Swiss-Prot record:
It comes from the Viruses. Residues 96-114 have a biased composition (Polar residues). It is a multi-pass membrane protein. The chain crosses the membrane at residues 11-31, 44-64. GO terms for cellular component: membrane. Residues 75-92 have a biased composition (Basic and acidic residues). A lipid is attached at residue 2 (N-myristoyl glycine). Keywords: Lipoprotein, Membrane, Myristate, Transmembrane, Transmembrane helix. This is Uncharacterized protein L682. Residues 73-114 are annotated as: Disordered.
Length: 114
């Protein structure tokens, strides 16, 4: 039964990903037409760059809003109202002391000669 639930969840994620991928191409075409209409190539790189940065900022803000709306917040968060984004750095740190894990490195690099 656990495999069925896992498969159902994985299949749902793949299906949602495919829908988002298809929708992204539709948005790409629309945004390219808007860009060509209001910022033709004759306007120069500066105005097209400003347009690209503006659209990127708007899309990032929408993504953060949707993340919070759907409750996709960190489960390990201490404060339930905390909406900050945290990244998993466990491959870099050992998780307990906040310092890099150097257990495989030699501690004494000096060479003794007799």
């Amino acid at each position: 039964m656990g495999n069925y639930i896992s498969f159902k969840k994985e299949f749902g994620l793949i299906l949602v990903g495919a829908i988002i991928f298809t929708a992204s191409y539709l948005w790409k075409d629309l945004l390219l037409e808007i860009e060509e209409k209001y910022f033709p190539k004759g306007y120069g790189l500066m105005w097209r760059s400003i347009y690209t940065i503006l659209v990127t900022v708007i899309l990032v803000l929408v993504a953060i809003h949707l993340k919070n709306q759907f409750g996709l917040v960190n489960k390990d968060s201490k404060d339930p109202k905390d909406k900050s984004i945290e990244f998993d750095d466990s491959p870099i740190r050992d998780g307990s002391s906040g310092t890099p894990d150097n257990s495989n490195e030699p501690t004494d690099l000096s060479v003794e000669t007799s």
